[in-house]
Each structure stands twice: as structure tokens, then as C-alpha cells.
From Swiss-Prot:
GO biological process: mRNA processing; secondary metabolite biosynthetic process
Pfam family, one: CPSF73-100_C
Active site: 446
EC number: 3.1.27.-
Family to which this protein belongs: Belongs to the metallo-beta-lactamase superfamily. RNA-metabolizing metallo-beta-lactamase-like family. CPSF2/YSH1 subfamily.
Biased composition (Polar residues): 762-780
Keyword Nuclease: yes
Protein name: Endoribonuclease ysh1
Organism: Emericella nidulans (strain FGSC A4 / ATCC 38163 / CBS 112.46 / NRRL 194 / M139) (Aspergillus nidulans)
Regions of compositional bias (Low complexity) in chain numbering: 742-758
Gene Ontology MF term list: 5'-3' RNA exonuclease activity; metal ion binding; RNA binding; RNA endonuclease activity
Compartment(s): Nucleus
Bias (Basic and acidic residues): 605-619
Length: 884
């Protein structure tokens, strides 16, 4: 597996440049610093996930929608709906039918079943009653029903992978079907809680922290900030006290609730209380709404998704029904004895005391608002608020106990408000006096401040993003969480983005490859063992963000990939190079070459047919020439070279891949230059020089075949000049006049008046200002001596006596007969000497070394006498060694 970065490296990430692909982007299109129209976008590694699509219950028309125009919805891969409440799901039909959204939508089975009826009823209510004089229809009932098939359902605790995004829903405990989603993108784990509850109630499974998963980012609600609720038993007692107080004075109790969710929990509480208090059983409990009746069937269907209390009631009532023998007896836990269902207020006989659970919970429109306007003027009546009240709604205003409330349903029923006057709209409002009592006892299925903080601490995510909360509540919770950082080694980062605000958080996740197949059987070194262990090589396969390392043979089984091996062949015909020369050239480039002998199978592959093989062997037998089997060598462990001596054909064979192709190209480059490169010519010349036992006709044949074997001195001299120009520039000229020996000595030593010899540096003290090599002697005598010397040099194969090299202000002379270098500058002299030696070795033997006696100076300017090349080469410390 890939090595993980050490802690020090991880901590230094913040100081390093961050790749945009390593940043998690979070956009709040709704639900930022507010409660309502929840909609969030997360982007990471090119993947986009949309969380919820709700509408604001306190707003109407387009203003109730999230800010969809601020984001390109066509880039969204998947949309996850946490639960069916309107502030989390009612904008979904608009997204699917009115926008360019192209992704997939997921929710749980129970959520979709209730969502169908809830949104359908919501569309009908909004189309029949509104506080606006000009209503805006965002989508129709047909839009809603036509988009239902686009919604896919998933079960709790099951993992699904969509476009390399892994999602797992967990019970959230908020309402039936409500889910927390664990989202994994490229190893980054994000937990979105939605609305969740950790409280033990009568029918739902409370939310728990996913086990065995390290959460990197937690996106959680902050509805109640840091405020805490009283214990559950105290709230139930307060609820019953408030309800019975109103009933005892002959009033009616209005409990505004969402049609589904907390309403079912309150019905269970009331049913249980009425069961134990016979004096109340004569007072009816009403649950009004056509949608509520239909959705109760869903609750009866998904008993298996509820907690043990509901399952116990189900088994108990099933046993009672079986014991009675009456099959008509209802046996479900949702078949109430004291709760009656009403389709509408038209069938409601408003006489005497009662308890009425009506929707919607925010009292904006609908049945609950109509009953509020009807019962508010009577001081014997009472309103009990049990859910969370969103800012800007009538439910929130009613908690302040105003003296008057605005009549909406009465105005719509009487037709008032449809004729607008030129005056202020405030003057046209119908106000109703409020004399009823108002109590608030929270049974909202949201975590309070203590439960939320404990959940965040248990998850231990390094990054927390707070949503779904009013700004002041959210900031109080943020301050509390940041205050806990003083006790932590790893500080928690808390973000509270507002609507349309972008948050970018850098994350660098280690890329971990899973080793599978044959490679998984390799024993890896333990921590106690020294060394890095064996080198593991294989094929790295990426499927989405998952990496797997496997042997090529396992690709079909573990990756589902079909493998194809491409064998490449290349044929090159050489005119004269032998296998020895080829091997020598390849070894100089690639190191040791492995000889693998002959390959009969390869020979068979080269033969096109059996008839051609027989014909070839017959011809070879007629010629009575013994067949030489091809020689095979392996270069770099991947390229096979076969040399056929008779045809001088070289065959290359290798398995095609990026690395092998590069090696094969390099081998072909060596083969294509093996007959023309100066180094190869020199090597072949060395081999041919000392084998005098070869037949002359064979040697002549090889010279004829090799175009470099018959090169003359002029060609070699031109190559020498080319190499020198590459090193010292173009200011290089041949020396036309040779060095002439003095008449008094056979050597070239110059003596001063005292009989001491002068060194070359003393003789060349004025060389940089002179351009010819003659001494002031008689021109006629000098011309004859020069002519004789030139003739002698030409006879030796030396085209010119020497070469003059000018570099800036310095001049160096090279005499080609003995390769002596003369220069007043020691650095340039040494440099020229080294280049000359390398050049002569490259272009092979230049010419014979003169046999006349010479004086060659060493580094100290002392004279060393010699009689030939052998003597010169044998002297230690020479500046120039003659090359034979």
C-alpha cells in the first residue's frame, strides 16, 4: 500500500500550496443562518452532491425557493433528500421539472411513500389559499406526479456507489424514513445529519454515530443552538396539564402540527393518557386532514422500520386479536381507540370541548390557520405549540401573544382582498382579536444544545459545518464548540456559512492502493524488520477513486479487463558489421548483454510456410555451405536481438509497452550507427590490425564492405578538424610551413649563449603575436628544407604539418607528426592536449610517427630525447603520448 505521510508532514499542509482539486467546496443555497428551504452543495475531486431541496414555509413564490440561480445544477451528480418535510423536500418537483438538473435523486422508501401524498396535498392547498393577491405557481400537481419515477429509493445501512460517490443512509430519528447520509468521495468521509433526534420516543429509532468510520466533515443542524429541553417525562406532564386545563374550562385545544412526523408521536402520547384516564375518554381527539389519513397507511406498512416499542405493541395487539377470534378487530399499533380522523372541517361538529391536531404546523394557511381564526377570540380556548416555529411565520408571532392576528383564511373565504384599493395594503387587512391562551411545550424532533454538542464530540470530526439554524442560535453553538478547543490537541474548525456563501476547506487524503491477487501473497516486512523489503511491481488499476495493485495475470479476474500482449519485431540489414562489433557497441550503451543462444521457435516464426523451409534447405544443401544458426542476445531484459550471419540481418523482438519501446528505439539507434560511428570504426580497426594470419583476399573483402576501411588521410584530417571546431570554435587553421631541423643538430633543441636549452614556453613567448613557424633564415635555403620536410610528412600520410588554434588572445599549435602541443597558456595547452588525444582515438590511427630524433618537453620544460614512437610512449610524465 502507499506510504502514509508522517504527522509532521500532515501538519505542514496548511503552509503548502493547495491544489484546487484537494479542496472541499461547500455552498449554502438555503438553510444558511436560517431555518427553512434547506439546500446545500458539496464538491470534491470533481464530484458534486446536492443535499435536500426545500422551500421556506414563511415565504411564497420564487422567494420561498433556495437560490438555485447561484449554482449550475446540471453539474450535480446526485441529490439526497433527508426526509419528507416541506422545508427539505418541497422544491424537488421544481428542480426535476423546471431546471437543468441531470443527476440522480435518492431517498428512503418511507420518505418517498409519504412525500408523494404530502407534496400533492401541499400543491392543492397553495393553489386554493394564499395571502398573496397574485399567486405564483412554481409547479403543478402534474409536475410532481410525473417526476416521481425519477426518484430512487434505498434502505438504511446499505452502501451504494454512484459515479464513484459512495453513500450510506442511517436512521436520523426525526420522522419516519428520515436519514443521515454518510458520503464518501475519494476517501473523504462527510456525514450530513439533516434534521435528527437522539431522544428515545414511542415509535422512532434514535440517531446514532456510524461505527467503524472516521468522519472528516460533519454537516449538522443547529436549530436550538445551545439551549436544552427539560426531561421528556416533565414535558409530557406539562403537555397533559395544559390540555386538561383548557378542557376543564370547556374550551377547545388546537395543536398545530405537521401532518406527519411529530403528529404521530403526539397521538401515541394522547392515546396512552386517555387510556389511563377514563374521565377524559368522552372528550374526542381529532386528527384532521385527508393526507394524514392516507399517510397513516404508510406508518402501518413500515412498522419494521420503527423501534421496539411499536413492534411490541404490534405483537401484543395481534395476540389480542387472535385470542378474541374476531378477525375484524384492528391489531395495528396505529389503530387508535380514542383518536378520530376527519377529512375536512365540513364534517366537524364544532360543539363542546375537543383536542384538535391540525396542519400545517406554522399556521400560515390551511386547516390549522382556519381553526385559529375561528377559536382565537374565545378566552376558554387554547393553542398548544409543540413544534419548532420558524421566524416570520404566524406560529412564531403567536408565541409573542399578540392582541390581534391577521385574518387570512376568513379573507379568502369571503372574497375580500381580491379587489385592491389605491390605499396602503395594511389598511385592508382584517384583524381578529386573540383572547385564547398560548402555551409552548417543545416536542420537536430536533436535538437540543446538549444532545447536539455530545453528538459532535462523539463524531470527532476535525471540520464541522453548522446549518439549519437562526443566526444567533448558530453563533452561540459555534462559540461553545470553539471554547472546547482549549482541551483538544487537534483543533476543530467550525464554519457557519450564510446563504450563497462558499466555504473552501483543503483536504489531502492519502492515496491507498489495495493489493489483490498474486501480489497479495507476497510477504511484507514487519515493523521490527530492517530494510525496505522486496520491491513490489504490478499494474495499478483505478476504478473511480479506488486503487488496486495486481499482477497483469489478475486483470481479468479482479478488474474485469481483457489483456492483450503486443509483440513487436524489427528487421535491420547491416552491410559489414559482425556480431562481435554489434555486441561491443551494445555493451557500451546498455552494459552487460545476456547471450540466450539460438531460438528454434523464433526461426520457425520467420518461416512463412513449410514448403519455403524445405526449398531453402535444399538450396543450402546444393551450395554445400554449412548453415550458421542465428545468435541471440537479450538487452536490458526485454529486447531480444537475433543476428543471422549469412544474410547479415539483425532481428529485434520485444513486448510492446512504453518502457520496452523506448529501449528498443535506443537499440535500433545503436545498430543503425554501428557501421558509421567513429568509435565503431576505431574498434574494428584495432581488431583488424594485429591479425596478420588472415588471408589477404578476406581482408580486402572486409575493407571493401566497410566504407570506413579505405578512408584516406584527408578524410581523417577533416574529421579531426570537425571535432576540434566543436570544442574550440571555428578559428582553427592549418599550419602550412613545417618545423625545420637546425643544420647543427639533428634534434630541434634550441640553446642559448650559455649552452642551456630553452624550453618551449620560452621559445613561444612571442607566439601569440606571430603567425608563421619559420625562423629568420635564408629564404631559398629555407624553401628547400621546407619542401623536403613536407615531402617526408606527405609520405607518412600527414596532409599538413600542424594546426593552429586561436581562443581569444591565446594561440596553441599542434604538430601532427608527434601530436606535440605548444602554447604559452598552460590551461589551454592541457585542454588541447586532452581533446587531441580523444580525437585521435576516435578517428583511428592518424598516421605513422616520425622516426627522426625529437625533443619533447614535459610539464617542467625539461628535454626528453627519443628516437621514435615507442621511446616516446614509454617515458613517464610526458605531456603528449604518441598513438600508434
Amino acid at each position: 500500500m502507499a506510504a502514509k505521510r508522517k504527522a509532521a508532514a500532515m501538519n505542514a499542509v496548511d503552509d503548502e500550496p493547495v491544489d484546487p482539486s484537494d479542496e472541499l467546496a461547500f455552498y449554502c443555497l438555503g438553510g444558511g443562518n436560517e431555518v427553512g428551504r434547506s439546500c446545500h452543495i458539496i464538491q470534491y475531486k470533481g464530484k458534486t452532491v446536492m443535499l435536500d431541496a426545500g422551500m421556506h414555509p414563511a415565504k411564497e413564490g420564487f422567494s420561498a425557493l433556495p437560490f438555485f440561480d447561484e449554482f449550475d445544477l446540471s453539474t450535480v451528480d446526485i441529490l439526497l433528500i433527508s426526509h419528507f418535510h416541506v422545508d427539505h423536500s418541497s422544491a424537488l418537483p421544481y428542480v426535476l421539472s423546471k431546471t437543468n438538473f441531470k443527476g440522480r435523486v435518492f431517498m428512503t422508501h418511507a420518505t418517498k411513500a409519504i412525500y408523494k401524498w404530502l407534496i400533492q396535498d401541499n400543491v392543492r392547498v397553495n393553489n386554493t389559499a394564499s395571502s398573496s393577491d397574485q399567486r405564483t405557481t412554481l409547479y403543478t400537481e402534474h409536475d410532481h406526479l410525473s417526476t416521481l419515477p425519477l426518484i430512487e429509493t434505498i434502505d438504511f445501512n446499505t452502501t451504494h456507489t454512484i459515479n464513484s460517490i459512495r453513500i450510506t443512509p442511517y436512521p436520523a430519528g426525526h420522522v419516519l424514513g428520515a436519514a443521515m447520509f454518510l458520503i464518501s468521495i475519494a476517501g473523504l468521509n462527510i456525514l450530513f445529519t439533516g434534521d435528527y433526534s437522539r431522544e428515545e420516543d414511542r415509535h422512532l429509532i434514535p440517531a446514532t454515530v456510524p461505527r467503524g468510520v472516521k468522519i472528516d466533515v460533519l454537516i449538522t443542524e443547529s436549530t436550538f443552538g445551545i439551549s436544552s429541553n427539560p426531561p421528556r417525562l416533565e414535558r409530557e406532564a406539562a403537555l397533559m396539564k395544559s390540555i386538561t386545563g383548557v378542557l376543564n374550562r370547556g374550551g377547545r385545544v388546537l395543536m398545530p402540527v405537521f401532518a406527519l412526523g411529530r403528529a404521530q408521536e403526539l397521538l401515541l402520547i394522547l392515546e396512552e393518557y386517555w387510556e389511563t384516564h377514563p374521565e377524559l375518554q368522552k372528550i374526542p381527539i381529532y386528527y384532521i386532514g385527508n393526507t394524514a389519513r392516507r399517510c397513516m397507511v404508510v406508518y402501518q406498512t413500515y412498522i419494521g422500520a420503527m423501534n421496539d416499542n411499536i413492534k411490541r405493541l404490534f405483537r401484543q395487539r395481534m395476540a389480542e386479536a387472535e385470542a378474541s377470534g374476531d378477525k375484524s378487530v384492528s391489531a395495528g399499533p396505529w389503530d387508535f381507540k380514542y383518536v378520530r380522523s376527519l377529512r375536512s372541517l365540513e364534517r366537524f361538529d364544532d360543539v363542546g370541548g375537543c383536542v384538535m391536531l391540525a396542519s400545517p404546523g406554522m399556521l400560515q394557511t390551511g386547516t390549522s390557520r382556519e381553526l385559529l381564526e375561528r377559536w382565537a377570540p374565545n378566552e376558554r380556548n387554547g393553542v398548544v405549540m409543540t413544534g419548532y416555529s420558524v421566524e416570520g411565520t404566524m406560529a412564531k408571532q403567536l408565541l409573542n401573544e399578540p392582541d390581534q392576528i391577521h385574518a387570512v383564511m376568513s379573507r379568502a373565504a369571503t372574497g375580500m382582498g381580491r379587489t385592491r384599493m389605491n390605499g396602503n395594503d395594511e389598511e385592508q387587512k382584517i384583524m381578529i382579536p386573540r383572547r385564547c391562551t398560548v402555551d409552548e411545550i417543545s416536542f420537536a424532533a430536533h436535538v437540543d444544545g446538549v444532545e447536539n454538542r455530545n453528538f459532535i464530540e462523539e463524531v470527532s470530526a476535525p471540520v464541522v459545518i453548522l446549518v439549519h439554524g437562526e443566526k444567533h442560535q448558530m453563533m452561540r453553538l459555534k462559540s461553545k464548540l470553539l471554547s472546547l478547543n482549549a482541551e483538544k490537541t487537534v483543533k476543530v474548525k467550525v464554519y457557519t456559512p450564510a446563504n450563497c456563501e462558499e466555504v473552501r476547506i483543503p483536504f489531502r487524503k492519502d492515496k491507498i492502493a489495495k493489493v489483490v491477487g498474486k501480489l497479495a501473497q507476497t510477504t511484507l516486512p514487519t515493523d521490527n524488520e530492517d530494510g525496505d523489503g522486496p520491491l513490489m511491481a504490478g499494474v495499478l488499476v483505478q476504478n473511480g477513486f479506488d486503487l488496486s495493485l495486481m499482477a497483469p495475470d489478475d486483470l481479468r479476474e479482479y478488474a474485469g479487463l481483457a489483456t492483450t500482449t503486443i509483440t513487436c519485431k524489427q528487421h535491420i540489414t547491416l552491410s559489414s558489421a559482425s556480431m562481435d562489433l554489434i555486441k561491443w557497441a551494445l555493451e557500451g550503451t546498455f552494459g552487460a548483454i545476456e547471450e540466450i543462444g539460438t531460438d528454434e521457435d523464433a526461426e520457425k516464426e520467420d518461416q512463412q510456410s513449410e514448403s519455403e523451409e524445405k526449398q531453402r534447405m535444399k538450396e543450402e544443401a546444393d551450395e554445400e555451405i554449412p548453415m550458421e544458426k542465428p545468435q541471440a542476445y537479450l538487452v536490458m531484459g526485454c529486447v531480444v536481438i537475433r543476428y543471422h550471419p549469412r544474410t547479415r540481418e539483425v532481428e529485434l523482438q520485444w513486448e510492446g509497452n512504453m518502457m520496452n519501446d523506448g529501449i528498443a528505439d535506443a537499440v535500433m539507434a545503436v545498430l543503425l550507427t554501428v557501421e558509421s560511428s567513429p568509435a565503431s570504426v576505431k574498434q574494428s580497426a584495432k581488431h583488424n590490425k594485429h591479425h596478420h594470419h588472415h588471408h589477404h583476399d578476406e581482408t580486402d573483402t572486409l575493407k571493401f564492405l566497410n566504407p570506413h576501411a579505405a578512408q584516406d588521410a584527408e578524410e581523417r584530417f577533416a574529421r579531426l578538424l570537425m571535432m576540434l571546431e566543436a570544442q574550440f570554435g571555428s578559428d582553427i587553421a592549418p599550419i602550412e610551413r613545417p618545423r625545420v631541423p637546425s643544420s647543427t643538430e639533428s634534434a630541434t633543441t634550441t640553446t642559448n649563449g650559455n649552452g642551456n636549452s630553452k624550453s618551449d614556453s620560452e621559445q613561444l613567448s612571442s607566439l601569440e603575436s606571430k603567425t608563421d613557424g619559420a625562423t629568420p633564415q635564408d629564404p631559398d635555403t629555407l624553401s628547400e628544407l621546407e619542401a623536403a620536410e613536407l615531402s617526408r610528412l606527405h609520405a607518412l600520410g600527414i596532409p599538413v604539418p600542424g594546426i593552429e588554434i586561436k581562443v581569444d588572445k591565446h594561440v596553441a599549435r599542434v604538430w601532427l607528426e608527434d601530436l606535440e602541443v605548444e602554447c604559452a597558456n598552460a590551461v589551454l595547452r592541457d585542454r588541447v592536449r586532452v581533446v587531441i588525444e580523444r580525437a585521435v582515438e576516435t578517428v583511428a590511427s592518424m598516421w605513422s610517427v616520425g622516426r627522426s630524433s625529437k625533443t619533447i618537453t614535459n610539464g617542467g620544460g625539461k628535454e626528453i630525447a627519443g628516437t621514435g614512437a615507442d621511446d616516446v610512449a614509454s617515458k613517464p610524465g610526458l605531456e603528449v603520448a604518441a598513438r600508434a
